[in-house]
UniProtKB/Swiss-Prot annotation:
Protein's name according to its UniProt entry: Regulatory protein E2
Annotated region (Disordered), positions in chain: 127-240
Post-translational modification as stated in the protein's UniProt record: Phosphorylated.
GO biological process: one example: viral DNA genome replication
C-alpha cells in the first residue's frame, strides 16, 4: 500500500483530495481489487421478485488504476444486467461484480431485478443471470443485444410465458383425455380403470404429504446434539437456501461478555485455570470503535464453545462477575 501511494504521489492525480478512507487497505482491496476508488454508490439486486431476498453491491463513480507502464488512469464505473464494470484505457470492459455469482446461491430461478438510482434492469428473453457463466473480462456480447435489438418489456415477457404455460397445460389435458378413454374387455366393468399419474395419488387430486420432499444433494439436517458443533467456516458453493441453512446450523456458539476491562481480564484468568474444559477458547478484551450509540460503550470479550450443551453447562456452573452481562450468539467460523 505504501508503494501504491508513493506512485500516486508522482502522478497527475496527486493534488486531488484523498481521505483516509479513500487510501485505506480495505478500500484498496475492495472490488475492483488493487485500485483506488471514490464516490461509492449502492446497487441492489432483488432475486425472484422478493424484496427480502436481495444483495447490495458498490458501484464506484471514480476508479484509479495503474497500467503495465506504471501510468495512472482514471475511469468511471457503469452497470448492466450482467454486473458492474469499468472501461480501461484500451477500451476493454472489465467486470468487477458479476451478479450471476450470487444468483447461483440465493435465487431459485437464477433471475432478478437490478435497482440503481432511478433505473430498474430486468431480464430479457436472451439475457438473464446465467448461472455458471464465467466472470472476469468481457468485451463482446452475443444474442439479440449484439444485433442491436431492443429488449422486450417485462409485461410482454410475462405474457409470452403465460401463453406458453397455457399451451403446455392444454397439451397435457388432451394427452390425459386420450389415455383415459375407456377400453372394455370381457372382464371389464362399466367403470373405466385409471392408472394414477406419476406424483399423484389415486383419485386424480394431488394431496398434501406429511413431509416436505428434500431436493437431491441437500445435506441431512443436524441433530440437536450436532448444532454448533463445527469451528470452521462453511464452504461457499452453489446450493439451495435450505442447504445453506442446514450447513450454517453447525456454526459454533459463542458468548459475548460486556463489562469493565480489568474485570473481564481477571475473569478470563480464573476461568482458564478453574474451568478449562468448559469452553473452547476466549478472546482478549476489546471495544467497539466508531460508536454511534452509547449502548456500545464498555469492553467486550468473546467465549467460544464446541456446542450448545457446553455453553449451557458453562452458564449453569460458572458464575459471572458482578457488572458483567452475557448474550448468546454464533459465528460462521473461528
Amino acid at each position: 500500500m505504501y508503494l501504491c501511494l508513493e506512485s500516486l504521489q508522482k502522478s497527475e492525480f496527486a493534488n486531488q483530495r484523498w481521505s483516509l478512507v479513500d487510501t485505506s487497505i480495505e478500500t484498496f482491496k475492495a472490488p475492483p481489487e488493487n485500485t483506488l476508488k471514490k464516490r461509492g454508490q449502492h446497487v441492489t439486486v432483488i432475486y425472484d421478485q422478493n424484496a427480502m431476498n436481495s444483495m447490495v453491491y458498490t458501484l464506484w463513480k471514480e476508479v484509479y488504476y495503474v497500467d503495465e507502464t506504471e501510468t495512472w488512469h482514471k475511469t468511471s464505473s457503469d452497470l448492466d444486467y450482467d454486473g458492474i464494470f469499468y472501461i480501461d484505457n484500451q477500451g476493454n470492459k472489465i467486470y468487477y461484480v458479476n451478479f450471476q455469482d450470487d444468483a447461483a446461491l440465493y435465487s431459485n430461478s437464477g433471475m432478478g431485478q437490478v435497482h440503481f438510482e432511478s433505473k430498474v434492469l430486468s431480464p430479457s428473453v436472451t439475457s438473464s443471470l446465467r448461472v455458471g457463466s464465467t466472470g472476469g473480462q468481457r468485451g463482446t456480447q452475443t444474442g439479440d443485444h449484439a444485433r442491436g435489438r431492443s429488449r422486450p418489456s417485462p409485461r410482454s415477457s410475462r405474457d409470452a410465458r403465460g401463453r406458453q404455460q397455457r399451451a403446455q397445460s392444454s397439451s397435457r389435458s388432451r394427452s390425459r383425455s386420450r389415455s383415459r378413454s375407456p377400453t372394455k374387455g370381457p372382464h371389464s366393468s362399466g367403470r373405466d380403470t385409471r392408472l394414477p399419474s406419476p406424483g399423484r395419488p389415486p383419485g386424480g387430486r394431488r394431496r398434501g404429504t406429511p413431509e416436505r420432499e428434500r431436493c437431491p444433494g441437500t445435506p441431512t439436517p443436524p441433530t440437536p446434539d450436532q448444532v454448533g458443533g463445527r469451528s470452521s467456516t462453511p464452504k461457499r458453493q452453489a446450493s439451495s437456501r435450505l442447504a445453506q441453512l442446514i450447513d450454517a446450523a453447525y456454526d459454533p456458539p459463542v458468548l459475548l461478555l460486556q463489562g469493565a476491562a480489568n474485570t473481564l481480564k481477571c475473569f478470563r484468568r480464573r476461568a482458564t485455570q478453574a474451568h478449562p474444559h468448559k469452553f473452547l477458547c476466549m478472546s482478549t478484551s476489546w471495544t467497539w470503535v466508531s460508536k454511534t450509540s452509547p449502548l456500545k460503550s464498555g469492553h467486550r470479550m468473546l467465549i467460544a464453545f464446541s456446542n450448545s450443551e457446553q455453553r449451557n453447562c458453562f452458564l449453569a456452573s460458572v458464575r459471572l462477575p458482578k457488572g458483567v452481562s452475557a448474550v448468546k450468539g454464533a459465528l460462521d467460523g473461528l
